[in-house]
């Protein structure tokens, strides 16, 4: 699917609201990238975008990127070192499976929002916002 066509089907305000709600509860950062390029290696492309966005610069190493490449019909979810240490591969695989189910039904916005919400829950549990009285783990 062409990225512009894909982007037109997204409810951007809903995705932004989900990111804002998730980030209110954590010191972590969540980003969503819709790539205009075709990629056969979504994980490598996501890792490059993760670095380009500076998500690796957080002192707590608690950033998450949901990277979607509509031209290739692929996506990847990248969590920084500290996030991955808290959840391991199983969390990412399960999240990717659920998001894939949404995407197969062309429910792109709900799929991305689900990913944002689950990443936010993980971040809030392990990297809570001090504004909410939480302490970093």
Model-predicted segments: where are they?
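A structural boundary signal for the start of the first folded domain, especially the loop/turn
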Residues: 1-137
